[in-house]
């Protein structure tokens, strides 16, 4: 199994175990950091991106992957590596889909209850 496949399995286990959104996202960032020199999740708050959980040193601009919930961008996954190839992008886009429900900081549910 590829490194991305192993990381995806670990992330799926984290999501299956559940917990509060902050803890889940920190654990996902830690898994990704084993393969990328910097990983961070930025949340859309009042139209601005605000950095949340992150690991590593952000020496250059990261590759950014939008994180959506109900077809609206709610956050962004950023990673830095020597090289990001097409396989990395597919993997990171899959991770973004999986963690979308955990990235609803400031999300207006209109009073409706929600759970990831």
What are these regions (language model features)?
Residues 56, 80-81:
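A generic structural motif
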Residues 61-70, 75:
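A short, aliphatic-rich beta-strand micro-motif
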Residues 72-79, 101:
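Sensory beta-strand/linker motifs that couple input domains to effectors
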Residues 47-60, 86-89, 114-115:
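Signal-transducing coupling segments at domain and membrane junctions
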Residues 2-5, 9-52:
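Helix-loop-beta substructure at the N-terminus of cytosolic sensory domains
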């Amino acid at each position: 199994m590829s490194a991305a496949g192993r990381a995806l399995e670990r992330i799926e286990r984290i999501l299956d175990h559940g917990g509060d959104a902050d803890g889940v996202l920190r654990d996902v960032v830690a898994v990704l950091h084993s393969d990328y020199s910097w990983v961070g999740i930025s949340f859309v708050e009042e139209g601005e991106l605000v950095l949340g959980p992150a690991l590593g040193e952000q020496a250059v601009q990261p590759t950014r992957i939008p994180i959506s919930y109900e077809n609206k961008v709610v956050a962004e996954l950023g990673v830095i590596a020597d090289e990001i190839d097409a396989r990395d992008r597919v993997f990171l886009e899959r991770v973004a889909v999986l963690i979308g429900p955990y990235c609803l900081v400031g999300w207006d549910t209109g009073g409706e209850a929600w759970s990831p």
